[in-house]
Structures are given as structure tokens and as C-alpha cells.
Amino acid sequence: MSSCSNVCGSRQAQAAAEGGYQRYGVRSYLHQFYEDCTASIWEYEDDFQIQRSPNRWSSVFWKVGLISGTVFVILGLTVLAVGFLVPPKIEAFGEADFVVVDTHAVQFNSALDMYKLAGAVLFCIGGTSMAGCLLMSVFVKSYSKEEKFLQQKFKERIADIKAHTQPVTKAPGPGETKIPVTLSRVQNVQPLLAT
């Protein structure tokens, strides 16, 4: 299993090689004591990689779709209200022998009809979008059951791996009082005081 310093070190070496800059002078080695990895070790291990959940993205999709559908419905209702509540203008007036047709009134009334049509279309698009997104939210919850199953399977796999590995250090048994060879002799590394 690779450590974070190995992963980060390889990335830093690649970045230094690509950047082409060299450092001269006194170097601080604090970076070896503090990990600056933004990625987790588990993301680089093949044993611990799992597929990212499609649940998050589909959740975002249906929420954004529901909001946009609501906006379309409100916009459609507003445009429909304008189309129906604004009174149409009189297009033709006059006597039976002499009738005058107002072209601006004809254009205005056709614009009101277009408002009614556009409002109905926007309302239908928004309603369809809202219905589809609400159905999508139901199907997303069924994905979460599958995801829980995959998480449980992953936890079982991790438990199997932990069960088969031996612990690094064990507490000595009741009859074991041996000192390890490396710790049997303690060597002082501090300089002696000159008296």
C-alpha cells in the first residue's frame, strides 16, 4: 500500500519536471512531516476504489429540472395572464358603407394571441418538466437501495481484508518477557557535558 508521501512525492516530482524549475539553497524538510495531499490514500489504492455514486448527480439533475420547470410554469402563467387580461383593441369601426380597419389594432390583437399561445406552451413545458423530475426523484431513491447494497458489500470486503492481515504489534503473552534485539541496548546520542 502506498503512502500519501509517495503519492504526493510522485506528483510533486512530475510538477517540478514539467515546470522545469530548480531550487537552490537551504531546503526545509517540514513537508515530510506534514502531508499536503488533498486526495485520500484510498483513491489511489486499487483495493479500495469504488465507483462514484450516480445518486449525487441524478439528485442534482432532478432538483435543477424541478426548479426550472417551476420557473417555466410561473412564466407561462404570467404570459397567459397578460394574453387574457389585456383587453383587445377594436380592429374595425365605421358605418356599413364606410369601414376603417386599424392595422395597429390588428397587430396588437395578433400579439395578444401569440402571448396566449406562448404562455400555454411554456406552461406545458414547465408542467412536463416538473412531472418528469418528480418521477426521476422516485427512481433516484431506488438507486439508493442499490448503492446501500454496494456499500455493504464494500464494508464486508474491507472486513475480510482486515481479518486476514496480522496486526503489526501484539501485546506480549503472559510467558513472553523478551526484549527485542534492537531495544536491548540503548545508545545515548546526546553530547556529553564538558565539566
Swiss-Prot record:
TM spans (from-to): 66-86, 120-140
Subcellular location: Membrane; Cell projection, Neuron projection
Protein biosynthesis recorded as keyword: no
Source domain of life: Eukaryota
Keyword ATP-binding: no
Keywords: Cell projection, Membrane, Transmembrane, Transmembrane helix
Any one GO BP annotation for this protein: nervous system development
Membrane-related topology note: Multi-pass membrane protein
Record InterPro entries: Neurensin (IPR024883)
Major localization listed first in the record, in broad terms: membrane
Tissue specificity comment: Expressed in brain. Not detectable in other tissues tested.
Gene Ontology CC: cytoplasmic vesicle; growth cone; membrane; neuron projection; neuronal cell body; transport vesicle
Function per UniProt: May play an important role in neural organelle transport, and in transduction of nerve signals or in nerve growth. May play a role in neurite extension. May play a role in memory consolidation.
Entry's family note: Belongs to the VMP family.
Protein name, UniProt field: Neurensin-1
Record organism: Homo sapiens (Human)
